[in-house]
């Protein structure tokens, strides 16, 4: 699963996930893309699960790009532990997603197959998504 090899600090503050995606909102690599319409957090497991659904559906055809990376640690205290005594240990990693962010891209397959594959992948994600095509100016 995806997670940073090393970070400057082990734990991060929760923070806020406001605004729209300023970067990573255009289809850069592939022909078709899955774009987030809602805001939220994607865990490394969810990103991997959707990637597997994509690769299994397109089989050997096409190339897939993952445009998000889980770089934020989420901590959790063990069960039945009283409050206080410091922050919990890192439980999993998340990518914070703003509306407009491109999550996955694909090329080398037909539009129909890409739509089917992205529908399967979107079912694995906790966000509302949309299918977008690359626009060449």
From Swiss-Prot:
Alphabetized HAMAP family for the sequence: Ribosomal_uL16
Name of the coding gene:
rplP
Query: What Pfam families does the record tag this protein with?
Result: Ribosomal_L16
Any GO BP: translation
Organism the protein comes from: Pseudomonas entomophila (strain L48)
Q: Which SUPFAM superfamilies match?
A: Ribosomal protein L16p/L10e
Keyword set, alphabetical order: Ribonucleoprotein, Ribosomal protein, RNA-binding, rRNA-binding, tRNA-binding
**Protein name (record):** Large ribosomal subunit protein uL16
What job does the chain carry out?
Answer: Binds 23S rRNA and is also seen to make contacts with the A and possibly P site tRNAs.
Q: What subunit structure does UniProt give?
A: Part of the 50S ribosomal subunit.
Task: Report if keyword tRNA-binding is assigned.
Answer: yes
Name the family: Belongs to the universal ribosomal protein uL16 family.
Q: Carries keyword Transferase?
A: no
Q: Might you report a single GO cellular component term?
A: cytosolic large ribosomal subunit
Q: Provide a Gene Ontology MF annotation, just one.
A: tRNA binding
**What InterPro entries does the entry give?**
Ribosomal_uL16, Ribosomal_uL16_bact-type, Ribosomal_uL16_CS, Ribosomal_uL16_dom, Ribosomal_uL16_sf
